[in-house]
């Protein structure tokens, strides 16, 4: 893959952007920038090649700059770039939902969201609404696990078990219980199949 460095613009002012999960002051002293991507690699403005080991944020699993994806997105944007989902729809959303439920037989309905964090908060609301709808609105307790990550919405950081994600925000959702985490390198570092250690935590 040949990248033209001359086409890359490096910003000379980094102050306007507030980056999530980042020490912004340190970053702006020594910025780490990606300017292009191809396949499973990112490229820095000076042309260095960096393996994308996390597929973006787990959302570029097919690789970067895949021509079929680019062509499909371009074709759709030229026809219909956006349509709201409140009280109105568009044909492809229903077609896509039908294809998904056809692939995963255990599920009969689909709700599209913009991110994992929104998905988690939506799932929590659905769970509460379901219990209220069947006459058991007193069932409001959620169970999470220490060190568990469920996004960065208020619901997700409430049931999640990463305390630094919560410490600056005061009270979260009430009625949350956190079970002990199962991460133990000493017992589970080199285990084939189901680990022998950890079953006792199910008693929590």
Task: Tell where the protein language model's regions lie, with residue ranges.
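Short, well-ordered beta-strand elements within core beta-sheets of diverse protein domains
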Residues: 41, 59-62, 177
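Short beta-strand-to-turn element immediately C-terminal to the catalytic PLP-Schiff-base lysine
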Residues: 43, 63, 156-160
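Tryptophan-centric aromatic hotspots in well-structured domains and transmembrane helices
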Residues: 16-18, 58, 141, 149
């Amino acid at each position: 893959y040949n990248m033209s460095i001359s086409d890359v613009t490096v910003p000379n002012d980094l102050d306007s952007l507030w980056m999530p999960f980042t020490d912004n002051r340190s970053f702006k002293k020594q910025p780490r920038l990606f300017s292009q991507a191809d396949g499973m690699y990112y490229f820095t403005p000076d042309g260095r090649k960096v393996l994308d080991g996390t597929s973006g944020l787990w959302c570029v699993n097919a690789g970067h700059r895949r021509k079929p994806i680019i062509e499909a997105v371009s074709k759709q944007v030229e026809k219909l770039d956006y349509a709201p989902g409140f009280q109105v729809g568009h044909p492809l959303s229903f077609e896509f939902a039908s294809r998904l439920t056809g692939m995963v037989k255990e599920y009969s309905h689909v709700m599209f969201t913009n991110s994992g964090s929104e998905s988690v908060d939506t799932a929590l609301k659905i769970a509460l609404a379901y219990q209220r709808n069947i006459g058991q609105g007193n069932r409001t307790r959620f169970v999470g696990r220490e060190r568990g990550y469920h996004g960065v919405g208020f619901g997700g950081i409430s049931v999640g078990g990463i305390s630094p994600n919560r410490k600056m925000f005061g009270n979260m959702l009430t009625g949350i219980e956190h079970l002990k985490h199962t991460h133990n390198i000493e017992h589970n570092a080199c285990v084939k199949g189901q680990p022998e250690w950890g079953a006792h935590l199910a008693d929590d």
